[in-house]
UniProtKB/Swiss-Prot annotation:
Similarity section: Belongs to the UPF0173 family.
Taxonomy, superkingdom: Archaea
Claim: Transmembrane helix is one of the keywords in the record: no
Gene3D superfamilies: Ribonuclease Z/Hydroxyacylglutathione hydrolase-like (3.60.15.10)
UniProt KW Hydrolase keyword: yes
Protein name from the UniProt record: UPF0173 protein PF0020
Amino acid sequence: MKIVWCGHACFLVEDRGTKILIDPYPDVDEDRIGKVDYILVTHEHMDHYGKTPLIAKLSDAEVIGPKTVYLMAISDGLTKVREIEVGQEIELGDIRVRAFFTEHPTSQYPLGYLIEGSKRVAHLGDTYYSPAFTELRGKVDVLLVPIGGKSTASVREAADIVEMIRPRIAVPMHYGTYSEADPEEFKKELQKRRIWVLVKDLKPYEGFEI
């Protein structure tokens, strides 16, 4: 499995011959992403939905998201669109995706996604700390966690989430575009609490394999 951070909350996950793009924000570079098979959108806010219509049309990709995203995509003229709800599981090629609840009060239907292929990746979208994340404990190899604060978890809340879920690898996101949060502070917070997890502090369009 290969995971590439494309900035903000946007990731490209490639596994078992399937390419999934998550939350393509308005400034993402579609040329550097290339062709994808599916686009997962966690919620309707434009810093997550952003370039979904453009990239979907360029790639002939299917767009998957909660009700608000489904309606937005249809209104944008897309035809390969699927709605997903909390607790629902779907198959994307040889990859299984399950939608789960996230704590983002300014969104109508906020979701996170557990992506299960050769490894298990959880994308939290925009969220604060939530006790509901106990369902993910021990089930996540790579956690994509927001640290930006304001409308998402702060550095300290992100550490709370990591402590609860206990992934092997944590990748900070949702900073550097609309937030001045520092991933180094996230690392320090984890170290201070003696939460031993590998933190991948990526540059935009940098990736790794697991």
